[in-house]
């Protein structure tokens, strides 16, 4: 565990700045599409998104005028979005996807301003125009499509329990009774426990990032963590004393989030993702999976198929 704690300490947060004057300006469009809210009220397949297009609109034009894509990311999620302690560079599956978006819109994968945002600040960062996109293992669900717009799914995950290997906790079941369980604020893991906790103690044990849950687990302050299995696998890779318990108990999809009303940006993102999924084992998606996730999440043969809607 000491090695994992050392890696944790090596990560320094990038601030989600509130001021102007850095050439970043406002991000995204301003209008809110009523049709999206109506869809949320009758939600069945929230992962359906607008059909892809390369046409420019207000949101794309603003990014091009600025000359930089502002991306809200995590830098504490191993394999997904984290700061390499040896080089100081942001790396991971989500970071590769951000770079693909920047290359498509601006012609250069390096034209990105990264802003680290906590789990519970992802929606607010979009509403307040602090970022153009959030690429941060953000689950698409019926509640969230009332607040933000999403691309098609770029990864399928599920909620799962992480606990010490020697723990009597067996998974998302009665073995959690009386146990202290950590979740991230604003996460679907918290929502799952709020709906059915099996007697676990989780109120007052939320943190701003999933990595903080791992630290609490290492320090013995909590008995288990509930989070996306994709994130939990990365946490287990950082600390060989913990492991995933039981099976995933939900099916969730990650999407790129943007401000409501930024339809042109959503369509452009879906165009980028269509290209990103292509090529089979030699395509960008499978190469990124092989580089970042395959060792900890083996067995994935292809990216999730996109689902579209017409309005």
Language model region names:
Residues 101, 126-127, 176, 217-218, ...:
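Hydrophobic residues within well-ordered alpha-helices
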Residues 121, 137-146, 218-251:
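A ligand-binding cleft/hinge motif common to bilobed small-molecule-binding domains
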Residues 56, 112-124, 169, 205-215, ...:
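Short helix-initiation/N-cap motifs at beta->coil->alpha
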Residues 30-54, 167, 187, 256-296:
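Extended ligand-binding regions for polar small-molecule ligands
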Residues 99, 110-174:
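Acidic, polar ligand-binding/catalytic clefts
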Residues 155-163, 233, 237-273, 295-311:
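Periplasmic-binding protein-like
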Residues 90-105, 138-141, 157-209, 224, ...:
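Bilobed "Venus flytrap"/periplasmic-binding protein-like clamshell domains
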Residues 26-134:
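Extracytoplasmic small-molecule ligand-binding "clamshell" domains
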């Amino acid at each position: 565990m000491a090695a994992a704690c050392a890696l944790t300490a090596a990560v320094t947060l990038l601030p989600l700045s509130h001021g102007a004057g850095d050439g970043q300006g406002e991000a995204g469009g301003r209008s809110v599409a009523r049709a999206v809210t109506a869809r949320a009220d009758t939600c069945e397949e929230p992962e359906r998104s607008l059909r892809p297009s390369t046409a420019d609109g207000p949101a794309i034009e603003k990014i091009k005028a600025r000359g930089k894509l502002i991306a809200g990311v995590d830098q504490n999620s191993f394999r997904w979005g984290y700061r390499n302690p040896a080089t100081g560079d942001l790396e991971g599956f989500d970071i590769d996807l951000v770079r693909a978006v920047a290359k498509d819109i601006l012609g250069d994968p390096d034209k990105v301003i990264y802003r680290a945002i906590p789990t519970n600040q992802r929606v607010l960062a979009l509403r307040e125009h602090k970022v153009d996109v959030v690429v941060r293992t953000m689950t698409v669900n019926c509640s969230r499509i009332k607040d933000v717009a999403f691309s098609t799914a770029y990864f399928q995950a599920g909620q799962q329990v992480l606990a010490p290997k020697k723990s009597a906790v067996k998974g998302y079941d009665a073995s959690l009774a009386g146990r202290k369980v950590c979740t991230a604020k604003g996460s679907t893991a918290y929502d799952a426990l709020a709906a059915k906790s099996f007697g676990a103690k989780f109120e007052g044990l939320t943190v701003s990032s999933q990595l903080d849950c791992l630290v609490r687990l290492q320090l013995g302050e909590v008995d288990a963590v509930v989070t996306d299995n994709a994130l939990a696998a990365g946490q287990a890779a950082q600390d060989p004393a913990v492991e995933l318990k039981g099976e995933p108990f939900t099916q969730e999809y990650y999407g790129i989030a943007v401000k409501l009303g930024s339809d042109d940006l959503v369509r452009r993102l879906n165009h980028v993702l269509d290209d990103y999924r292509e090529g089979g084992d030699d395509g960008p998606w499978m190469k990124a999976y092989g580089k970042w996730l395959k060792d900890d999440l083996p067995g994935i043969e292809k990216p999730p198929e996109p689902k579209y809607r017409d309005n």
